């Protein structure tokens, strides 16, 4: 199965091949060694763990019960707690390459850390956001066109923070099931759950791997049968044409991270990090205050912030300009 889904970080793989594997192939990819700096992952893991302990709760898992821990909005929270780590972590080249291959240049990253404790329960097999979260009765009301479009608007991913052997519960995948035409309607049914448990595949993960899969593939996180916790940062990467699951505080991301970008000279890395920091799409907006420009779309926030970085614009000036830009997009009744 490795040759169907595994790509090594130093392989030269085309955009078309990435897209084909996710759409018509196995439906999943593992990028071995996508993060070469394992000390970076350790530092980010420490930041996540401190935040989880500080919040003192065990956030719910949509598809599993028990004492597993969740850290919602791990993107904003890393910017708040360890902004010096943000660019290297969320600006990873493979994260950008696969996201752009599936969604194009306008995409939005959200992230939720999942810690599966020893003995932690597995998830039930499911499809993911958007329609994977809808009850069957509502999915049945959706036109077939929308069901097919749902999986094209999101990419699921995970940054692997520790070695995950099979007994620790790497993601269970029903390879090729992303093309089951009625999957969003049927995945909860007992016969489909039985099929999933009978036919799923698992591949061990290594610390530093990146995992991606089509959101409509039938999948589930496995149970942790070891004595060590499993820490993975789950990524939901959305097309700018769709609504992501989480709300992001973009001004806070700029406020915390931009000063650290000024110390970085790697333009490609900075450009990728900026994709994770600001709104990927200029709509919705208040067209009275923010009227269409000659090119209709106007200047994207990603373009604006990269120009500011190139000019070494001060953090205070950037934040003031950004606040004004955001305010122009909001309609307020008199």
Regions found by a protein language model. Give the residues of each.
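Fe(II)/2-oxoglutarate
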Residues: 1-24, 274, 280-284, 288-334
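A short secondary-structure junction signal
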Residues: 121-127, 134-137, 167-174, 182-186, ...
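A short hydrophobic beta-strand segment most commonly corresponding to one strand
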Residues: 175, 227-243
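Non-heme Fe(II)-dependent double-stranded beta-helix
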Residues: 1-136
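Active-site-adjacent segment of 2-oxoglutarate/Fe(II) JmjC oxygenases
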Residues: 236-286
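Acidic, His- and aromatic-enriched active-site or binding-groove loops in soluble protein domains
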Residues: 127-151
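Double-stranded beta-helix
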Residues: 141, 150-220, 241
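Glycine-rich phosphate/pyrophosphate-binding beta-alpha loops
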Residues: 218-225, 229
